[in-house]
From Swiss-Prot:
Similarity annotation: Belongs to the MurCDEF family.
UniProt main location, coarse: cytoplasm
Task of the protein: Cell wall formation. Catalyzes the addition of glutamate to the nucleotide precursor UDP-N-acetylmuramoyl-L-alanine (UMA).
Enzyme's top EC category: ligase
Organism of provenance: Synechocystis sp. (strain ATCC 27184 / PCC 6803 / Kazusa)
UniProt keyword list: ATP-binding, Cell cycle, Cell division, Cell shape, Cell wall biogenesis/degradation, Cytoplasm, Ligase, Nucleotide-binding, Peptidoglycan synthesis
EC number(s) stated in the UniProt entry for this protein: 6.3.2.9
Catalytic activity entry: UDP-N-acetyl-alpha-D-muramoyl-L-alanine + D-glutamate + ATP = UDP-N-acetyl-alpha-D-muramoyl-L-alanyl-D-glutamate + ADP + phosphate + H(+)
Protein's UniProt name: UDP-N-acetylmuramoylalanine--D-glutamate ligase
Metabolic or biological pathway: Cell wall biogenesis; peptidoglycan biosynthesis
Classification via InterPro entries: Mur-like_cat_sf, Mur_ligase_C, Mur_ligase_C_dom_sf, Mur_ligase_cen, MurD
GO cellular component terms attached to this protein's record: cytoplasm
GO biological process, one term: cell wall organization
Top-level taxon in the UniProt lineage: Bacteria
């Protein structure tokens, strides 16, 4: 029986292990962590005949190399173990690549980008489902891709949100339609340079049969046309903004408050409920994918009327004494947080901080000076953020450390300063205090609802 190892016991790792085991592999799952939660998650695998090694790692000195290694998205692609495995001829892939090997006969929409991926993916899936298609979302959202393999349904399309980590470990994944939402510095601690990060993202679009790019993104606008001369482009700034990118009849754009897709009027933009120009950009990309997949205007318009957003992305939680509390926990870098704050209509109390990332904070700081009447700082980044705010002449900040303190103080300051909203938009990863941005957002939700 051939040997396979899965590294990482998350949702992706569990699904990958089951796919391999189903197809006759002798599977061992490794995870360096060992706790009650992981043991509980792994127990069904053990009962199914899959080996589980917690608090341990694959050691080829103690045991022979397996024929195959599948890694979860959180495992760096260049760790010495995986480099050595590839040199030994071991097949090393990510979980998404494993799923692609089973599901490549189904057309995929692959969505990548620094920011905007999840909302765009959710919009694409919503439109496709409104059109009556069996089009599940997977990857960085929804199902682990290998869960779709196990369900073994007759899929019309697969809609995949694909991170740079997943692209890196999926060398043959080739969507029918590839969408690139935005590009700004992120994940540099993993990818080392901006060029590496860009090239990883670009490789997915290069393998896609049809490319769609956001023409409002400066980096894509500058570098995309040479890479993808046949690409379709989108813009919230009118047909003229597509000049030099594509024929407007081959793009999707806003003109006079109407969505125009491939030369056809689709719907007035005021039907769309989500705030912010960035969400309009996400919508245009989703409409481009839908029209390229042959979906009619009716399904698109009906989705515009009913789609209200996704959790942790400018998600309204509640209103207390006229102050709206908004969860933008997904804003894990400066650019996403700057976009979130810019979408606020009135004076805002901002909650920021967490595990800081590399990046240019200038536009974010400028937006704070323009929109935030006070900033409440949490997590490990709080002292550094305080220093940065002070350096640009912004003094109305407080280090409050925890989410509960921030929410309580936010309500007090909002009342005192006539602010219309308290916005959690951290500009940071969450791993100093939480396991994920979702967990951070749920803590914010619980703290807010505790004040109602």
């Amino acid at each position: 029986m051939p040997q396979a190892c899965v590294i990482g016991l998350g949702r992706s790792g569990i699904a990958a292990a089951r796919v391999l085991h189903r197809d006759g592999w002798q599977v061992t799952v490794f995870d360096q962590a060992d706790n009650d939660q992981l043991r509980h998650m792994g127990q069904p695998l053990v009962q199914e005949g899959i080996s589980l090694k917690l608090g341990d790692r694959l050691d080829p000195v103690k045991e022979a190399w397996p024929e195959r290694i599948v890694v979860s998205p959180g495992v760096p692609w260049d760790i010495p173990l995986l480099v050595a495995a590839r040199e030994k001829g071991v097949e090393v892939t990510g979980e998404l690549e494993l799923a692609w090997q089973y599901l490549h006969a189904v057309p995929w929409v692959g969505i990548t980008g620094t920011n905007g991926k999840t909302t765009t993916t959710s919009l694409v899936q919503a439109i496709f489902q409104k059109a009556g298609l069996n089009a599940p979302a997977c990857g960085n959202i929804g199902y682990a891709a290998c869960e779709l393999v196990l369900q073994n349904q007759n899929y019309d399309w697969i809609v995949a949100e694909i991170s740079s980590y997943q692209i890196e470990s999926s060398p043959t994944l080739a969507p029918q339609i590839g969408l690139w939402t935005t590009f700004t510095p992120d994940h540099l601690s993993r990818h080392k340079t901006l060029e590496n990060y860009f090239n990883i993202k670009a490789s997915l679009l290069s393998r896609s049969a049809i490319q769609v790019l956001n023409g409002d993104d400066p980096h894509l606008h500058s570098h995309g046309p040479n890479l993808y001369p046949q690409a379709h482009w989108t813009s919230t700034q009118g047909a003229n903004h597509l000049a030099g990118l594509c024929d407007p009849k081959q793009g999707v754009y806003l003109q006079d408050n109407w969505v125009n897709a491939f030369g056809e009027l689709i719907a007035p933009i005021n039907l769309f409920k989500m705030p912010g120009q960035h969400n309009q950009q996400n919508l245009l990309m989703a409409i481009a994918a839908a029209r390229l997949a042959g979906i009619d205007k009716k399904a698109i318009t009906e989705t515009l009327l009913t789609f209200t957003g996704v959790p942790h992305r400018l998600e309204p939680i509640c209103t207390i004494n006229g102050v709206q509390f908004i969860n933008d926990s997904k804003a894990t870098n400066y650019d996403a947080a700057e976009v979130g704050l810019s979408s606020m209509k009135g004076p805002t109390i901002l909650i920021a901080g967490g595990e800081a990332k590399e990046g240019d904070d200038q536009a974010w700081l400028a937006q704070i000076r323009q929109k935030a009447v006070a900033v409440l700082l949490i997590g490990d980044a709080a002292p550094n953020f305080a220093t940065r705010l002070k350096a640009v002449g912004y003094e109305n900040y407080e280090i409050v450390e925890t989410m509960a303190n921030a929410v309580q103080r936010g309500l007090e300051l909002a009342s005192k300063n006539n602010a219309s909203a308290v916005l959690l938009s951290p500009a940071c990863a969450s791993f100093d205090q939480y396991n994920s941005f979702e967990e951070r957002g749920e803590d914010f939700r619980a703290c807010c609802l505790g004040l109602v």
